[in-house]
Amino acid sequence: MILDIEMLRSFYASYSDSVKQAKATVKRPLTYAEKVLFAHLYDPTQLRPYKRGIEYVDFRPNRVAMQDATAQMALLQFMNAGKDKVAVPASVHCDHLIRADVGATADLPEACKTNKEVYDFLKSVSQKYHIGFWGPGAGIIHQVVLENYAFPGGMMVGTDSHTPNAGGLGMVAVGVGGADAVDVLTGQPWELKMPRLIGVHLKGKLSGWATPKDVILEILGILTVKGGTNAILEYFGEGLDSISTTGKATICNMGAELGATCSIFPFDENADEYLRKTGREEIAVLAQQNASELRADDEVMANPSAFYDQIVEIDLSKVEPHLNGPFTPDAATPISHMKAKGPANDYPMVVEVGLVGSCTNSSYQDLARAASVARQAYEKGIEVKGQLIINPGSEQIRFTAERDGILDDFKKIGALIMTNACGPCIGQWKRHTDDNTRKNAIVTSFNRNFRRRADGNPNTYAFIGSPELTVALTIAGRLDFNPATDTLLDKEGNSVKLDAPTGYTFPPKGFAVEDKGFIAPSADNANVEVVISPDSNRLQKLAPFAAWDGKDLTDMPLLIKTEGKCTTDHISMAGPWLKFRGHLQNISDNLLMGAVNAFSGESNKVKNQLDGKYVEVSTAAKAYKAQGISSIVVAEDNYGEGSSREHAAMEPRFLNVKVILAKSFARIHETNLKKQGMLALTFCNKDDYNKVQEDDRISLTGLKEFAPGSKLTVTLKHQDGSEDSFLVEHTYNDTQIAWFKAGSALNFAAKK
């Protein structure tokens, strides 16, 4: 059964005409990303040649996807909107709350028991408001979306930063916060700054141990975690033909680590085959009928530099297997360099655990190729040195992989098969170790490797690679093992070499599954009741934030001046805190607990200016709030890098933090702050960051003249009586300023 088929038929019936009208209006050929964007304008009569990276544009996405950790807050907000049902097709996926411990057989029932209140809430909200519900164990959101919902030429938003995964099948798929999702769910325009376009030209063909994962790991080394901010990466070139749809999805998935709005590949025969193999032949036919507009125009391909803002050249034949890390996904290292780089940087060289899975690399092809490496270790008599953990991407993949013997290949070398869920990738991992503070190395096929992310240990050095390389390094137990050149010893002491991985793109017998774990939207929702206990410590109804009082912000205490990388993991930690994602008051206790205090070098320890004592960040914020005092956070570059979790914006707002002043922001987080009525401001001169002192009282003036393009003034009153003043800037437009004045975007929408 093809889900939401009527919407898809309607979309394709008008798509090509919409693109042709766009070309006639802007009077030039279009890139593929532009075609999709222009075909989804909220008001097509407003179509014009928008200024990339400058103008905000209103769009009308086709659908919304939500995962269980972020869906709670999104749907709590939606419930306040007064709607009977969602305006566009939507789905909820229960994948983030399942803890990996001893294996799927025990872990899944335990998760269903532990999270029953949240699952029941999400299920009932989904039934009441006509939302598709994928229960615990059904799979990871982005793999399930790729298998069931993604379609060429479409536009989707999702409350998860790796939503761009669907770009592998030709979608503009963008990670957003819950408030953005609510805009789409209620039929309002969804606002996005018109993205810049980065063209990535792929030529040649991957070979040996090189994989699509290594392509994006190499690009991360080139562009860094900020290089894609407010941009779409559009891939083109002859190299595309040799990369499968799931391989392309992997590349698009980790575009999130570049800070990109999304990434996209054009429709091709690989996409056509993927649609047919996943039971969506009618969509394949519809896409073929629109094929000429599901790729960039020929004139663009003839002269790419005239149409893209930047070009990145990648020769696939020269791509090496990579290990990126530790602690940041853009620290790119070809595996051939690790023998020198590892010791030089004092990396722990023993690989203790290898983890295969995540939304980035959990497809059938990923598991099949990784299993071919595991099978060699078993057949060649190689003793496996590390622990191997596997998370399949969906129940359909798990069932098919088990039928085809793939999971047995892993089990034969001692691998542990976890639930079809995020697990360790999002910090949901009960790691069995002798010392959870010890310096050690793990290798994963995941997407992020921030300090403490996987297991909570700040001394775990996490490196990102392909599933194939992850298995090879786990077998060898060494970070510097190069499977292309190095040998291992079998049980008789003979030197043996691992052959390059192989594996089917699709299961030869086709995909199979007994129960996908899906509950379809129901039209019979009149008697569905959504109950939230007032005594719950996991779910809490939301109260509107207060509107701006019309005054400047004066004499604010500094809550924290953060030093270095401050991701959404640092601002609102996941792992054990995921259970409070539906309870704003409780989860606010983790505010900025991972951020490093620039004055002490310590985490979660700041000076409470009311009594001079050093306390947890949330404790200081609550003390200020109790006295009716607003506070401010000062930060460095790319503040809010990482996930789309809007809790990282809602928590400071809840605790009366009014301003985040940073050197620069990550795209999603900046939008989330604006949506919650906060002020996300940047230094005009980044050196002014150094003027901020621990005991400062900080004032922000000029808010009565707050307007697009205007500058505001920050004044620092130092403890010694001296002062510093400097200008700060912002990216707010008129609508976003209205959100601030109303107290939040939801407040503003409610007033309209």
Label every PLM stretch briefly.
Residues 3-4, 68, 149-284, 382, ...:
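Mobile "lid/hinge" segments at catalytic clefts and subdomain interfaces of large enzymes
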Residues 8-11, 15-195, 581-633, 638-640:
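Long, structured ligand/cofactor-binding scaffold of large enzymes
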Residues 42, 46, 51-60, 74, ...:
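Terminal amphipathic helices with adjacent charged low-complexity linkers/tails
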Residues 47, 147, 151, 243-249, ...:
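Short glycine/threonine-rich loop-to-helix capping motif typified by GTGT followed
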Residues 76-80, 306-401, 405, 523-659:
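Non-catalytic terminal/interface segments that mediate subunit docking, oligomerization
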Residues 379-429, 435, 643, 649, ...:
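Extended C-terminal subregions enriched in glycine
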Residues 488-505, 670-739, 746-749:
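Acidic, glycine-rich flexible loop/linker segments
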